[in-house]
Amino acid sequence: DEMCGDYAKASLGRHIAMVLQDPYLFTGTIFENIQYRTCTADRNDIERAARTVGAHDFIAGLPDGYDTLLEQQGRNLSLGQRQLLSFARALVADAKILILDEATANIDSYTERQIQIALARLLEGRTGIVIAHRLATVRGADRIVVLQDGRIVETGTHAALIEASGLYARLYALNYASFDDIPGDLLQRVTGDKART
């Protein structure tokens, strides 16, 4: 076992990629924005990453495809499209650790579903640290840590936390009460509702 402090910050940085709630995109082409973390990625690498995370179709549909010039912060794209570019960038960077900070916040349900699929592909074979209020984002995690007022109040898998009927189960039931993985009696206990929708 080695301590993180034994590594130089630059060395650690090469192994970590971040996808933020509001992705950083710069004025430049889509190709350049995806290639940002690695100069060695060629057109095939960029397109493969975009296909993997589900961004290729929207990129190919743009008049200049991967050569489309982005405005500052990617203002000429939707938030969901910017997120997908950020996922493609993280995939091309081939980092071992991914930090996803509210990566699905402020997007519609359809786009969230696309991004959930992209997230699953992006996290394959990597360690992911996912900071989320949308609990569907962490549902498949090996370990969920629930914080309240800066303190850890629960840890476990989705199934274990639902069964425990604690804070996670209450939040999940309030947001996703129609999902089949919440037993009716649990839904009633955590929400106080007698009727199931």
Protein language model regions, located:
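Hydrophobic anchor residue at the start of the ABC signature
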Residues: F87, I131
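C-terminal portion of ABC ATPase nucleotide-binding domains
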Residues: T52, A60-G61, I117, R134, ...
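ABC ATPase nucleotide-binding domain helical subdomain, centered on the C-loop/LSGGQ "ABC signature"
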Residues: D6, F31-Q72, A120, G125, ...
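Conserved catalytic loops of ABC-family nucleotide-binding domains
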Residues: R121-V130, V138
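ABC-family nucleotide-binding domains
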Residues: D101, D108
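ABC ATPase NBD Q-loop/coupling interface
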Residues: D1-S11, R113
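Conserved signature/switch motifs of ABC ATPase nucleotide-binding domains
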Residues: A93, L100, E124
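ABC-fold ATPase nucleotide-binding domain signature/coupling loops
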Residues: H56-L85, I107, S178-T197
